[in-house]
Amino acid sequence: MQLVVARIGRAHGIKGEVTVEVRTDEPELRLGPGAVLATEPAATGPLTVEAGRVHSGRLLLRFEGVRDRTGAEALRNTLLIAEVDPDELPEEEDEFYDHQLIDLDVVLADGTGIGRITEISHLPSQDLFIVERPDGSEVMIPFVEEIVTEIDLEEQRAVITPPPGLIDESEAVVASSRDEETGEAASGDEAEAPKGDA
């Protein structure tokens, strides 16, 4: 089975290095020297990792046969794809591969159906579930433990406790309308700090 493990970004320097947007929790395994990766578009690959290093918090890779900036620029936006045993599981219990999450039913804690995961979007700050609603619309759900409280692979479902407005925009609380409804806060009142991680 194939998994997207990275996307190639800009060229770095003049010796063929590229920046890489990592899409795996195991970059040292999937993107280490000697790794042979399929590509999308397929005509670009396969690519073999020659060397890698971290520079200013970003992973830089150099591929065999790519020796200059021009060659590196030609790889921009290419997806890197690793072949993975479908029975292989991530090392950590609370980690999942994309293929394990695609097609899971998304439900609220009370069992109310929200939709089905159709895609996982890997952003620098967090991952997002792209969920297709029964009416065909899509909603994006951050894959963070405060919102996604349970992944049950046996039952094929993801249980969520979304904040107001995430699923149903009519539930969203807008600061200006809230002030109009409750009146202006007394000048001596202090705002309560939001709950959660500081």
Curated annotation (Swiss-Prot):
The keyword Heme does not apply. Residues 160-198 are annotated as: Disordered. The PRC barrel domain binds ribosomal protein uS19. One of its GO terms (biological process) is rRNA processing. Residues 92-166 form the PRC barrel domain. This is Ribosome maturation factor RimM. Binds ribosomal protein uS19. SUPFAM superfamilies: PRC-barrel domain (SSF50346), Translation proteins (SSF50447). It is found in: Cytoplasm. Residues 181-191 have a biased composition (Acidic residues). GO terms for cellular component: cytoplasm; ribosome. The keyword Manganese does not apply.
